[in-house]
Amino acid sequence: MEPTRDCPLFGGAFSAILPMGAIDVSDLRPVPDNQEVFCHPVTDQSLIVELLELQAHVRGEAAARYHFEDVGGVQGARAVHVESVQPLSLENLALRGRCQEAWVLSGKQQIAKENQQVAKDVTLHQALLRLPQYQTDLLLTFNQPPPDNRSSLGPENLSPAPWSLGDFEQLVTSLTLHDPNIFGPQ
């Protein structure tokens, strides 16, 4: 695993440990206010933290599937396939006192990049942390597109290593709430 850094999210209302070298996408292009998006400096990998409205009509594993399919619809996925959905142990989460249930999902979505016709199978790992007291579903996503076949610009050992599932797990387990006022009046 790469060295890491503790990073403020949503104006300091949250923080989490991100892999070293993660680039804040909001420095490159507009990002919706309910998202924090980070990209790998070399690969097409990305990490996304989203504050979403609680989907109270779905519970348990179905809630994780709902958000996975919703993301696929937003991204215009041509196909979505869930590989696994598992409950996430609350005791491992920094948000354990606030999170009522947590799920982790792995799957694939067939997505074409902007201005490209060919769709690629992108592996997605998602963690859904449910905070009903704040009417919020926290969705964390790790996008792992297939490796690019372009040759590296420099010696192999100078390029940062791709992020691993361990990097994503560290993001999920380290996510900490510092200011509940981000959710508005309760």
UniProtKB/Swiss-Prot annotation:
This is Ran guanine nucleotide release factor. Isoform 1 and isoform 2 are ubiquitously expressed. Detected in heart and brain. Its main location: nucleus. GO terms for biological process: endoplasmic reticulum to Golgi vesicle-mediated transport; heart contraction; mitotic spindle assembly; positive regulation of membrane depolarization during cardiac muscle cell action potential; positive regulation of protein localization to cell surface; positive regulation of protein localization to plasma membrane; protein exit from endoplasmic reticulum; regulation of bundle of His cell action potential. It comes from Homo sapiens (Human). One of its GO terms (molecular function) is transmembrane transporter binding. Belongs to the MOG1 family. GO terms for cellular component: caveola; cytoplasm; cytosol; intercalated disc; nucleoplasm; nucleus; perinuclear region of cytoplasm; plasma membrane. Overexpression can rescue the trafficking defect caused by some SCN5A mutations that impair trafficking to the cell membrane. Monomer. Interacts with RAN, both RAN-GTP and RAN-GDP. Competes with RCC1 for a common binding site on RAN and thereby inhibits RCC1-mediated nucleotide exchange. Forms a complex with RAN-GTP and RANBP1. Interacts with the cytoplasmic loop 2 of SCN5A. It is found in: Nucleus; Cytoplasm, Perinuclear region; Cytoplasm; Cell membrane. It is a peripheral membrane protein. Residues 27-70 are annotated as: Interaction with RAN. It holds the Pfam family Mog1. The gene is RANGRF. May regulate the intracellular trafficking of RAN. Promotes guanine nucleotide release from RAN and inhibits binding of new GTP by preventing the binding of the RAN guanine nucleotide exchange factor RCC1. Regulates the levels of GTP-bound RAN in the nucleus, and thereby plays a role in the regulation of RAN-dependent mitotic spindle dynamics. Enhances the expression of SCN5A at the cell membrane in cardiomyocytes. The lineage of its organism: Eukaryota, Metazoa, Chordata, Craniata, Vertebrata. Changing residue 53 to K: Decreased binding to RAN. Abolishes binding to RAN. Keywords: Cell membrane, Cytoplasm, Guanine-nucleotide releasing factor, Membrane, Nucleus, Protein transport, Transport.
